[in-house]
Amino acid sequence: MAAALGASGGAGAGDDDFDQFDKPGAERSWRRRAADEDWDSELEDDLLGEDLLSGKKNQSDLSDEELNDDLLQSDNEDEENFSSQGVTISLNATSGMVTSFELSDNTNDQSGEQESEYEQEQGEDELVYHKSDGSELYTQEYPEEGQYEGHEAELTEDQIEYVEEPEEEQLYTDEVLDIEINEPLDEFTGGMETLELQKDIKEESDEEEEDDEESGRLRFKTERKEGTIIRLSDVTRERRNIPETLELSAEAKAALLEFEERERQHKQGRYSSRRGGRRGGPLMCRGVGDQRRESTERGRMKDHRPALLPTQPPVVPQAPPPPPPPPQQQPIRSLFQPQPLQPLLPVQHPHHPSPPQGMHMPPQLETPRMMMTPPPVTPQQPKNIHINPHFKGTVVTPVQVPLLPVPSQPRPAVGPQRFPGPPEFPQHTPGPVPNSFSQPPRLPLQDQWRAPPPPQDRDPFFLGVSGEPRFPSHLFLEQRSPPPPPPPPTLLNSSHPVPTQSPLPFTQPGPAFNQQGQQPVFPRERPVRPALQPPGPVGILHFSQPGSATTRPFIPPRQPFLPGPGQPFLPTHTQPNLQGPLHPPLPPPHQPQPQQPQQQPPPQHQPPHQPPHQPPPQHQPPPQHPPQHPPQHQHHHHHHHLSVPPPPLMPMSQPQFRPHVQTAQPQASSSRMQCPQRQGLRHNTTSQNVSKRPMQQMQPTAPRNSNLRELPIAPSHVIEMSSSRCSATPSAQVKPIVSASPPSRAVAGSRSSQGKTEVKVKPASPVAQPKEEAKTETEFPDEDEETRLYRLKIEEQKRLREEILKQKELRRQQQAGARKKELLERLAQQQQQLYAPPPPAEQEEQALSPSPTNGNPLLPFPGAQVRQNVKNRLLVKNQDVSISNVQPKTSNFVPSSANMQYQGQQMKALKHLRQTRTVPQSQTQPLHKVLPIKPADVEEPAVPQTPRVASIQGRPQDTKPGVKRTVTHRTNSGGGDGPHISSKVRVIKLSGGGGESDGFFHPEGQPQRLPQPPEVGPQPARKVTLTRGGLQQPPHLPAGPHAHSPVPPGIKSIQGIHPAKKAIMHGRGRGVAGPMGRGRLMPNKQNLRVVECKPQPCVVSVEGLSSSTTDAQLKSLLMSVGPIQSLQMLPQQRKAIAKFKEPAHALAFQQKFHRHMIDLSHINVALIVE
């Protein structure tokens, strides 16, 4: 759809945009800037994907002419904006009208009239304006500076203004938008209605055209306007001139009629085929309306983006999805339209965030809708959906309901809606509107990237349709499993009155035009989405969290990719806490809670895929919502680097992250599952975040990255192969799934960005789903039979979708695993120590035995245990697939053995998981579990000690898989061991922080895992390291991560410090847990281990040597550390075995040169015990 939309958009006003869009230089400059500056902010990550690909490219291409034109034609632009805002208002005001669709069209028409004239006057300029607006939107959401730079590469001066202005504008716009929404609602209701009928026909073509143009340009137009000082004045002027827009509608009507006629022919044909082709007949109809809406939304976004800025981050995250389509430049634009949809999600976030802004605006749904959502709604149903809630008899009531609950709901809703994601975002935003908003959006951005981006075409609609599930359900569900979104729609639809907040967004975005029709479409879209999700398993990180932004708001966006994982972790971790608090908070906000149950029921069906993730957001959001502000900040910090902040921030942050990720993933790729499918782009596996990724996470995400990468891979954050599996186990959904989702994400990340996101999406959804079921019941009283039936159908569809996604995910993972196994087996054949696997098995057994003891203690929360259990089970499955994959790689020495061992471990882990969820985690997934499972570490040390050699070899493999597992388990432990996670995460961060700068506690873990997968490839040596130092390292890692001083243990140090990533992985699973919970115990055991191992380390195995590396070079390297006894080169195996005279030298060499690059080849240095 993105391509189709892009093409048609490009054809119309978009043609100019398209040409400029295609400019290679412009795109590069944008990317460069986006990369530099986007990376600066959390949202920037998303921006990179989205703005970079779509917005920034367009903007940079058009920035010179268009920006100048913008400045020169600020009046026109203002009018355009006015029309946009007018549209926004009209949407709300007109919501009274029967046709939300018309309403949107109307608004769009007005803006379309002006814009059509405007566009005719400045085809490029207008497009540019749109783009500029979109860019500004991002800019404002983002640091504003980076964004502006990114999208206004050529406008340094303007950029400066933008940067300065955006913040003011953000605040100002928010206020203005609120006012605007309030005033125009009344003013425009009449005018818009009048226009509605007149322009209805026109609007289709105009809005379609605008959609194309606005998707690309209008969006940037809005961004630019918002960023530009002119934009600031625009906001004010727009407010004043909104009536003008209506007035203009008379004059512009003629021009618009022509323009619309022309565009309709151009675009209707195009859109028809595009939208129809993409979405199907009904979808096409909806598409037209959606596009209209999108264009209107864009107009609104233009106007509202400033207002949305604080709240806009969610929008931006949604917008980021366009980046996935960026390849299709016009698709980007079309994505922009979908983007609005996704912004829709964010808008919904803005929706809720808007409440924070305009909490005083009980109509906030309306206002937010206008403010935040309206912009998104303009392009898609989001706004319409908002309108629908108002306009629908039912919707109006819901709107009112949200009004009351909005204040309370925002936060509580966060929890419930977190699963939807958008709600969470909104809720997130409510408390900490700016922070929450910007941060959740960040994740959403990436998450969106994760899941929604690929399915963006549908996502927008889903956003529109799923708008109710909104980000969380929508993106999460959407990305994770299209079915979940529909349930939220139903839930929201029926729940609409009750949890209007989420429902409203949902209704507004989704049902706005078709609230009722759309739901039918939903089913269609759902299927489509499922298709999308499968296609973009990662789809987001995004939904990774849409709730995408909400479910995975934290996860994908900020740490987009790590947060995804982190978020799942946080949610996992927080979930236990949040789950308790969440429910209470939720109940207080009665509506939110109903919504939560409501929304969650769909997720529950989704649980296998999305539940883990989604639920955590839902659970977490409320509790965290209140602290979300700080968490959001923390998220920021985490995003940047939470090494230190993680502990304090992590607890809150993590939940937030998770929610973020989850929201993001729903937004971006609400759940890994959706993300994966959506983000299939990013992550194959289960694809939210997005999500650090969504791209894989996971962030499902996830999604949703090391951070970013992860987000995209999964949103970052959302990566959960495991998560998917975890999701499969609804039991573990809340915590396990959350934790699973991140791990899954990591696995998926290893496997593929898609998987990661997909999984992540799944987790969020699953968790949310159970609640949703409750919610369904809770909200059922308020629901009419029709709504309930809708919801039930949607839930069923979600379930089916989840199953399908799960199957796909598993298939993907299995295939990936098979590939990895083949690769690893090949490597293993080349490597020695195939005998080690059996000892590892023993070790595993031993570890498992201790694990129960330790494992039980590890399970701090019953929830955690259950979660871990489910998660472990899922992880075990995943690990079989994903770890098998990793293991083969990891166990280069003993590929088959490693696999066996791994499987054996997994089997044991399964057993243990069932017995002691934590234990298996600590063992099978010690790294992950170890964080929470100190006992795991302890037992682990014992195990490693007993079969030191075997342990080292087998363990390393275990650890290696552990690395993968580590992420997975990490998530688990995160979910299971909420409290421990902080410290563990910290440790992980310290040791693994290097690996994952995200610094997101869990996100970090996941991102690391994602990165680790890549590392897994080059991890033959790492495996070796694991074999010797690795095994020790995991235990030592705790100490090492805690203080690399464990260096004395040498092995530990080497693995912990040198293979920081590896160590982190290990530490995560094993060592970290030790240092965290039993930092000291572990060190002792580590020391023992070291002692046992010390005799062993004289021999160093250097793997992954470049064929051009000579023994002389290698010898000089070795001699630089210490004297060597012998050096044996095995060129056919691309490895060398050297024996040092002193074990300390071997350790030092391993520490110094592990993952060192020689002749463009990264060598893996492992200590070999003789």
Curated annotation (Swiss-Prot):
Residue ranges of coiled coil: 789-835
Name the UniProt record assigns to this protein: RNA-binding protein 33
Sequence ranges assigned to domain RRM in this UniProt record: 1098-1170
Keyword Coiled coil among record annotations: yes
Effect listed in the UniProt record for changing residue 1169 to A: Does not affect interaction with ALKBH5
GO molecular-function term, one example from the UniProt record: protein-macromolecule adaptor activity
Species this protein is from: Homo sapiens (Human)
Example GO BP: regulation of mRNA stability
InterPro entries referenced in this protein's UniProt entry, alphabetically: Nucleotide-bd_a/b_plait_sf, RBD_domain_sf, RBM33, RRM_dom
